[in-house]
Amino acid sequence: MCIIIDTNVFGDVFNKESKSHLEFEPVINWILNGKGKIVYGGTKYKNELGCAKKYLKILVEFEKMNKVVRVDDEKVDAREKEIRKDNRHHDLNDEHIIAIVIVSGCMLVCTKDSSAVPFIKYPAFYPKSCKKPKIYSGKRNKNLLADCNIAPICKTKKKL
């Protein structure tokens, strides 16, 4: 399975000194030692990455290891724009995460933004053919890090 890692948990996933690292350590272990891959794309996500430069270097290393799948920025941006246009929920600021799920088919999001979770799982944002994602928010969800659920995008090297 691939995983979209919300930038709000980069420190927890990648920094062993983080107070919450043990909760997110299974994610990094699954990527390093299993078939897990990080999925990302879109202008907003890349801008958020730009604010987390020390983690950008880690992402580059994972890309060299074929552990990253980049989704077409234009497709993500277009879908994000549609979601934002149709959105009546003014509290939502993670349209880009939902757009990455839709464009990539990735079914797992790693986040600790509890206010975003209801929106990320909100069925009305997704086409009927798209499965709603599961949320990894801590060690209790490590059963979601299962190789048997690898999304098609993570089985190929090409960018969608």
Short names for language-model regions:
Residues 4-5, 17, 21-54:
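PIN/NYN-family metal-dependent endoribonuclease catalytic core
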Residues 114-160:
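Acidic, PIN/NYN-like endoribonuclease modules and their adjacent C-terminal/linker elements
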Residues 10, 46, 116-117:
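A generic structural signal for short hydrophobic patches within well-formed alpha-helices
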Residues 1-3, 108:
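The start of beta-strands in P-loop NTPase/AAA+ ATPase cores
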Residues 11-16:
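Short N-terminal binding/cap micro-motifs at the start of the first secondary-structure element
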Residues 70-123:
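Active-site neighborhoods of divalent-metal-dependent phosphate/nucleic-acid chemistry enzymes
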Residues 34, 66-69:
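Short glycine-centered helix-capping/turn motifs at secondary-structure transition points
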Residues 52-63, 119-128:
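Short, aromatic/basic amphipathic alpha-helical patches
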